[in-house]
């Protein structure tokens, strides 16, 4: 006698009745399966598994316009879903590109959200957006992010009323400052090890060759130098006096072993925001996976992939604040 475990839709002409009757199983995909009742010992219907809960992801290149400049990016969305979806804009760290945010954008799309990762203008030598590294400043990156948000809100696949930003390191600082613009009506922020310490680093490194590239320049930690315009803008800038009016939910995720941005900067931010939480990833340095490590990020434990801890936190935040 055979026992049958059924995890699909079924229809039966008999529930173990007369021996001449048959049991017919109708899979979601494939041909019906028939058994004589005499062949069946019992029928067990098991709960469905989560194996099919993730969506296939469609990734397309999409350019946004900022004045005469084009901003390169990639749009991630669930394949075959036509509805307008809550959308997360991913803002990368200094010296990196949109590619560094692939794991997070892809995970969001698999979960049913829309995500967009873009290259800041002059954000690195590898940027596919217009602009040069020499012209990049924090305020120029704020303008990039605002232009991206405005552009995406015009897309049919984007729910313009449910826009979030996920920013890492310098991208996290830019995201935090940008969110203070109430006209954007962002619904929330997710910040990975936000670089709220940049003004302090500039002040410190002014004593040791400056914040630019070259031996002794702290810019080397991030993979490249910084312009005088960048340093002048952020020198003596009070980050915490310029954030904190954003009242929507803020999720900050920071590594306990971060040697570039100490976790204390995020602890201070949580005290400033009216609605913020901090999750500390034990053992993580400046970057939660290999795509997001700065020049010194590989030291002190960051070579390990922490996305198995980080991505569930991101998805939990989204399911709470933008349920599908």
Language-model-derived ranges and their functions:
Residues 100, 134-156:
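Alpha/beta-hydrolase active-site loop
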Residues 107-128:
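Conserved alpha/beta-hydrolase
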Residues 246-247, 252-254, 258:
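Short beta-strand/loop motif that positions the catalytic acidic residue
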Residues 85, 92-96, 256:
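Active-site glycine-rich loops that stabilize anionic/oxyanionic intermediates
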Residues 292-324:
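Catalytic active-site module of serine/aspartate enzymes centered on a nucleophile-bearing elbow/loop
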Residues 52-80:
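N-terminal cap/lid segment of alpha/beta-hydrolase-fold proteins
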Residues 94-106:
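The serine-hydrolase catalytic nucleophile loop
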Residues 177-229:
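Hydrolase active-site cap/lid region
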């Amino acid at each position: 006698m055979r026992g049958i475990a059924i995890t699909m839709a079924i229809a039966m002409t008999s529930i173990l009745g007369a021996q001449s009757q048959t049991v017919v199983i109708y899979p979601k995909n494939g041909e019906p399966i028939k058994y004589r009742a005499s062949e069946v010992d019992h029928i067990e219907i098991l709960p469905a598994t989560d194996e099919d809960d993730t969506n296939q992801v469609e990734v397309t290149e999409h350019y946004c316009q900022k004045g005469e400049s084009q901003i390169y990016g990639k749009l991630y969305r669930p394949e075959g879903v036509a509805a307008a979806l809550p959308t997360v804009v991913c803002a990368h760290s200094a010296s990196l590109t949109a590619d560094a945010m692939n794991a997070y954008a892809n995970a969001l799309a698999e979960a049913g959200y829309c995500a967009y990762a873009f290259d800041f203008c002059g954000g690195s030598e590898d940027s596919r957006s217009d602009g040069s590294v020499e012209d990049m400043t924090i305020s120029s990156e704020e303008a990039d992010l605002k232009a991206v948000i405005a552009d995406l809100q015009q897309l049919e696949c984007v729910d313009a009323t449910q826009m979030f930003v996920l920013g890492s390191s310098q991208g996290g600082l830019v995201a935090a400052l940008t969110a203070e613009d109430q006209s954007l009506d962002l619904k929330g922020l997710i910040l990975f090890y936000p670089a709220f310490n940049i003004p302090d680093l500039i002040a410190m490194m002014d004593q040791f060759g400056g914040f630019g590239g070259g031996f002794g320049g702290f810019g080397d930690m991030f993979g490249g130098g910084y312009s005088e315009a960048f340093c002048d803008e952020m020198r003596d800038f009070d980050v915490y006096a310029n954030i904190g009016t954003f009242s929507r939910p803020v999720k900050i995720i920071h590594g306990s072993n971060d040697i570039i941005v100490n976790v204390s900067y995020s602890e201070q931010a949580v005290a400033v925001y009216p609605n913020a939480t901090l999750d500390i990833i034990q053992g993580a340095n400046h970057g939660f996976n290999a795509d997001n490590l700065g020049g010194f990020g590989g030291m002190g434990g960051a070579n390990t992939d922490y996305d198995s801890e980080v991505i569930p936190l991101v998805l939990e935040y989204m399911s709470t604040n933008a349920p599908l």
